[in-house]
Amino acid sequence: MKHVKRGNVISMCIVALLVNISISQYCLAVTTEEELKNWPLSCYTADELNKVREWEKTWVGKKINQDNIDQVKEFMTEQFYNMFKNPKDWGVDELWFTIVPYQQLPVTPGQVALTKKHAPTAKLDPNPRKCFWKEGIGPNEFLMGWEKGETAGFPFPFPKSGIEMAWNLESNTRGDTKSLDRVGVVVNPRTRVERRAVQPWLFDYFTGRCDAPPTPNKPKNPKGIRRAMYLFIEEPLDVQGTRYMELRYLDVKKSDDVWVWFPLFRRIRRMGFSYKADTIDGSDLAPDDEVGWNGHVNLKTWKIIGRKELLVSRHQDLDQLTKQTGQAVWNGYMMERTNSYVLEAKWKDKNAVYSRELLYMDPEDWKCLQKVAWDRQGRIWRQFFFNTMVVKSKQGIVQPHNYELYSSDLQRRHGGPSLDKIVEIGQTIHNRFWSIQNLQKLGY
């Protein structure tokens, strides 16, 4: 009997040792300095790019509409194809775009330097963590050093799992500090009615800053703010003067703070965390949908489905975009082939607004290119485009900028073509701006 017990103890020790070794190996840095020597890389290998260039000899400069879209259908999501194949459903007789040559997106000098500094030591925590959402954070989900603001750049430039890719998405600080004017319309193509929206926005990252001083973190941040966001509604007139401020924290035990100034009551109201899943001012866009996912990485599970070549707008000339009244999608997109990753996201909360999301990720700067979302019943619901142009910051740094966050409801069939017009990138915003007192002052 003693021998049996001793054997059981030895077996348990061996199993524990093997589990410990496997966890340790999983959490070792996945990126080596040797790999980073030639980074950043194109989304295509040399051989793949040669094939793309041959294809471009036939297609670059061609106008694509419902008559010839079937010939390039393989480079689209089903939802994008259906939209441009059936333009009358979206308020116009013809939807069209043109094909342009592929160009590699620039990665900023700060992103390159900080990625090469931090990626070789980036790893996921082998231990579970408690957080403000009941589903918790499992082993090998949380980026170590994140809660202290010790990370910057892309932690996993060569991701091997969905969670690593999601951390790359979260780590893109998009110019560090940015102000823009979002001007667009929500269109019902059946009635051709448009509801105009004008919203100045501010974004300010407190940690992981790459190019705009101070880097990598803003000083005097006792609350541990990760990112701050502010918007003011100028139009439509019925909600003019509404102001929204959102603070996300590094500490996963601390829920996001969302404050809204309502001019009608001249009062500030603190909104619940679930408010971020509600759409903004009658559009199809919720705060959570910004940039593909605007929330804590570990609220969802992430899985790489594979690769998908897409035609996407990454080097757009805004003067080429046109639309008629009642048209729910822009004409004139300049589309180039891009070899994206397909990243599946599912909320851990089974009662969340989406049952499933597919994010098409750009492997050159780890931004979301397009997103498709399913409702709680598993039906296709919403489609998003995160279209890009190349701009310069206040510091003269060339970088990608999402000039449009397009959202559409595929069930009720309406959409929101818009433009995010840059005011400034890389400006200085004092920490005092991000306070309830200042939000109230701005309201008065």
Regions found by a protein language model. Give the residues of each.
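N-terminal secretory signal peptides that target proteins for export/translocation
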Residues: 1-9
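Bacterial N-terminal signal peptides
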Residues: 11-22
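Sec/Tat signal peptide C-region and signal peptidase I cleavage site
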Residues: 23-29
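Solvent-exposed N-terminal domain segments of exported/luminal and surface proteins
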Residues: 30-255
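Extended beta-strand-rich segments in extracellular/periplasmic secretory proteins, especially
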Residues: 128, 197-222, 234-235, 290-359, ...
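Flexible, processing/modification-adjacent segments and terminal tails
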Residues: 147-181, 185, 193-196, 250-255, ...
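Low-complexity, Gly/Ser/Thr/Pro-rich intrinsically disordered linker/tail segments
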Residues: 332, 411-443
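C-terminal soluble interaction/assembly domains
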Residues: 346-422
